[in-house]
Amino acid sequence: MIKQALISVSDKSGIVDFAKSLSDLGVKILSTGGTAKLLADAGLPVTEVADYTGFPEMLDGRVKTLHPKVHGGILARRDLPEHMAALEKHDIPTIDLLVVNLYPFVQTVSKEECTLEDAIENIDIGGPTMLRSAAKNHRDVTVVVDPADYATVLDEMRANGNTVGYKTNFRLATKVFAHTAQYDGAITNYLTSLTEQLQHRDRNTYPATLNMAFEKVQDLRYGENPHQSAAFYRDIAAPAGALANYRQLQGKELSYNNIADSDAAWECVKTFDAPACVIIKHANPCGVAVGANPHEAYSKAFQTDPTSAFGGIIAFNREVDETAAQAVAKQFVEVLIAPSFSEAAKQLFAAKQNVRLLEIALGEGHNAFDLKRVGGGLLVQSLDAKNVQPHELRVVTKRHPTPKEMDDLLFAWRVAKFVKSNAIVFCANGMTMGVGAGQMSRVDSARIASIKAQNAGLTLSGTAVASDAFFPFRDGLDVVVNAGATCVIQPGGSMRDDEVIAAADEHNIAMVVTGIRHFRH
């Protein structure tokens, strides 16, 4: 039964209402510093921890709750007579509810002007100590680290005579240990990233020790293949616009492959300003287009490769209206992603309950780093988020691209970044015309892209081509030009650049180089 609570929070959202409800239930409230003042100013009966322990706060607040009267009241097992006798001997009441969240360390060190001293002063000591004590003794103590749990605790107390059940206490305790582990991990990441100058602005991007925290979203039926088990986890700091923050409106449970392909589709479509549609199959774009509206964008994207689009993942960067929904509904679709769906579109897809509809906020946020597991290790790199601008391009041929060709080149280059290497992408008029992906030789990717266009009944005459890396020989260039391309965008940097550029001049096409590569493995 909860008779006494200790409340000390940095995040004060909802705390006054929560404390008032506790007081109304007859719970005595202990508190510290700013939290105590906030509660007292709200007219709530509150006892300062310093008055409770008989020992004042000291060392500029570094020592507040590190006292036997606090930790004894938290850690004592109520089922052990010797523990309870020790409390009685030293006149220590039990503390049955602990409500604590920690100094904002992560927010502090994320500021550019943060110094080591600022960071050190935001390392909480008393808070984690109390939290761990309460979580360890969760059989007897309810511990709350997240304001989202206030309502649950109050509901159980009201229903059960100020008692919170063991199942809830256990869940809250596991939440505490996850929280303190994350907190300590953030401290370790920060301290091991410091250079010899020990200033925040001189931090190494990659700390000596890397700690990451993820929370489980769901178990999955299986992994990439049916014999593999799997689960989906969300980065606790996932930005609003990330796939992990999706809201599923309808459809079957997402599979491992659905999630992986959906991420590829969403990250690609977010890069376009105009209404865009991206169709993904096996993590590769098989159709990308922009248009005046979602319907036009989808119609153009679908034309690229109708065969591969069957059972694909489709993403839009605009609301899916009824017209677009009617077009999409004619095909077999696994997942449909958009910032929103009109009511008419929702009603239309309600008749197709197997189609998974995902809404995701169209934010600019994306992962800061790209991670790849290898045997016994982890590769970490900054995200390939570079979007080349026209003024950054260098024309290396005698013929310069026309304004229309330049638009097509930039579109093709944007798509190529999301195609598995080796990547060759034909584009024209804001749509992909042929995509060659994942081949061991660039010339084979060029041939496949050409064949794909031919199979879809598309002409490549007058198209722009993007190559995610340089042409090592002229053979790949010859293939795309013979297919109909009139301009090419590529990184440059090959030992045979002169030979490739000479071939471009021989064909009288325009070629621009970006100076950056977009390998994707």
Curated annotation (Swiss-Prot):
Domain MGS-like as annotated: residue spans: 1-145
Keywords in alphabetical order: Hydrolase, Multifunctional enzyme, Purine biosynthesis, Transferase
One Gene Ontology term of the molecular function aspect: IMP cyclohydrolase activity
GO biological process: 'de novo' IMP biosynthetic process
Reactions catalysed according to its record: (6R)-10-formyltetrahydrofolate + 5-amino-1-(5-phospho-beta-D-ribosyl)imidazole-4-carboxamide = 5-formamido-1-(5-phospho-D-ribosyl)imidazole-4-carboxamide + (6S)-5,6,7,8-tetrahydrofolate; IMP + H2O = 5-formamido-1-(5-phospho-D-ribosyl)imidazole-4-carboxamide
InterPro entries for this protein: AICAR_Tfase_dup_dom_sf (IPR024051), Cytidine_deaminase-like (IPR016193), MGS-like_dom (IPR011607), MGS-like_dom_sf (IPR036914), PurH-like (IPR002695)
Record pathway: Purine metabolism; IMP biosynthesis via de novo pathway; 5-formamido-1-(5-phospho-D-ribosyl)imidazole-4-carboxamide from 5-amino-1-(5-phospho-D-ribosyl)imidazole-4-carboxamide (10-formyl THF route): step 1/1; Purine metabolism; IMP biosynthesis via de novo pathway; IMP from 5-formamido-1-(5-phospho-D-ribosyl)imidazole-4-carboxamide: step 1/1
CC terms in the record's Gene Ontology section: cytosol
Gene3D superfamilies recorded: 3.40.140.20, Methylglyoxal synthase-like domain (3.40.50.1380)
Pfam assignment, any one: AICARFT_IMPCHas
EC number of the protein: 2.1.2.3, 3.5.4.10
Domain of life where this protein originates: Bacteria
Domain notes: The IMP cyclohydrolase activity resides in the N-terminal region.
Family of the protein in this entry: Belongs to the PurH family.
Name this protein carries in UniProt: Bifunctional purine biosynthesis protein PurH
Lineage, broadest ranks: Bacteria, Pseudomonadati, Pseudomonadota, Betaproteobacteria, Burkholderiales
